[in-house]
From Swiss-Prot:
Belongs to the adenylate kinase family. It comes from Bordetella pertussis (strain Tohama I / ATCC BAA-589 / NCTC 13251). Coiled coil: none annotated. This is Adenylate kinase. One of its GO terms (cellular component) is cytoplasm. GO terms for molecular function: adenylate kinase activity; ATP binding. It is an enzyme of class 2 (transferase). PANTHER family: NUCLEOTIDE KINASE. Keywords: ATP-binding, Cytoplasm, Kinase, Nucleotide biosynthesis, Nucleotide-binding, Transferase.
Length: 218
């Protein structure tokens, strides 16, 4: 099973990715993790990436694709892989395609923007332990305080409404075009084209998991 999960921040991709990697016995491939590992290991590509990052530059798509190719040769990718946060742009998707990196499915998790803002802006965390709550869906026993310690809960900067709206704008401008890119490719009937599936990300974790499983069997 070789796939990409697409969807806006807050759509629940992380939760569903954890389920898929366990279910299919495949690794979750994050370009951030790959970069850190390559830099730490001092591989030729890692050293090249470190030079760029130390100078405050952005690592090129060619370099990222090189890292992806290296990563996919490792034994844990024998049954497939799940791309996490990659590709983010059309040039990256083109580079992935040109490199002949195979995909079986591209799944879009669709959630209305208003739901995402509500989901993320109502999250609260206990900083010391990392325990998280949701004002509406998973509230603490006593309002505003941690269940275990009774210490106050906080809202992370990332979860503030204005930050969430900014991240959604970035997604719409940069990553949302991938939805059209992959759905068009899937409809083209080209030999290497992945299947494109769209599911609703509204509902309980188990409901979404069930939709995802069905989509990957169709």
């Amino acid at each position: 099973m070789r796939l990409i999960l697409l969807g806006p921040p807050g759509a629940g991709k992380g939760t569903q990715a954890a389920f898929l990697t366990q279910h299919y016995g495949i690794p979750q491939i994050s370009t951030g993790d790959m970069l850190r590992a390559a830099v730490k290991a001092g591989t030729p590509l890692g050293l090249e990436a470190k030079k760029v990052m130390d100078a405050g530059g952005l690592v090129s798509d060619d370099l990222i694709i090189g890292l992806v190719r290296d990563r996919l040769t490792q034994p844990d990718c024998a049954n497939g892989y799940l791309f996490d946060g990659f590709p983010r742009t059309i040039p990256q998707a083109d580079a992935l395609k040109s490199a002949g990196i195979a995909l079986d499915y591209v799944v879009e998790i669709e959630v209305p923007e208003s739901d995402i803002i509500e989901r993320m802006s109502e999250r609260r965390v206990h900083p010391a332990s990392g325990r998280s709550y949701h004002v509406r869906f998973n509230p603490p026993k006593a309002e505003g305080v941690d269940d275990v310690t009774g210490e106050p809960l906080v809202q992370r900067d990332d979860d503030r409404e204005e930050t969430v709206r900014h991240r959604l704008n970035v997604y719409q401008n940069q990553t949302r075009p991938l939805v059209d890119y992959y759905s068009s490719w899937a409809q083209s009937d080209a030999a290497a084209a992945p299947k494109y599936r769209k599911i609703s990300g509204v509902g309980s974790v188990d409901e979404i998991k069930s939709r995802l499983s069905q989509a990957l069997q169709s």
